[in-house]
Amino acid sequence: MLTLEELKKNTDLINEIEWNMTPEEAVKQYLEWGNTDWGSGKYVIRSKSDYTTYFVVNCWRKPYFIYLIRRNSQEAQELAKFELPSRFEKDVCELKGVYALEEEVKAWLKQELGV
C-alpha cells in the first residue's frame, strides 16, 4: 500500500482519481441496482474490468486515515493509506464511519498531489 509520498510520484494513478466519487456512489454503481440506467447517457458498468479510483476517510478510530480505493464489481482494493491531518479531524470525523472527502480535505489533497 502506498504512502502519501509514494502516491505523489505516481502520476498515472493520480490521473485515475475520480475526485467527486463517494463511497455510496461507488457501491451504487459497481455493486447494486444503480447500474441499470441505460437511457441516461451515463457510462454503464459492463464488466469487472471497469473500475473507479477514489478517496475515503476512515473515522472509526484514531488515528484517522485517508484511503485511496479502487473498486470494481468484485472487490475494493486499498491502494494508498495515510493519516488524516489533525486540523481536519474535528470537522471530518465528528461521527464514526467512512466518508467521502469534504471540500477542505479535497482541496488540501489536490494541492499535495499537484492536481
What do these predicted ranges mean?
Residues M1-L2, E112-V115:
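Short, aromatic- and cysteine-enriched interfacial helices/patches
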Residues N10-E16, A26-Y30, E78, D91, ...:
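Charge-rich, solvent-exposed alpha-helical interaction surfaces
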Residues E6-L7, S47, V105:
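Ubiquitous "structural anchor" signal
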Residues M1-T22:
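N-terminal trafficking/processing presequences and adjacent post-cleavage segments
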Residues M21, E25-A100:
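Acidic, low-complexity, intrinsically disordered interaction modules
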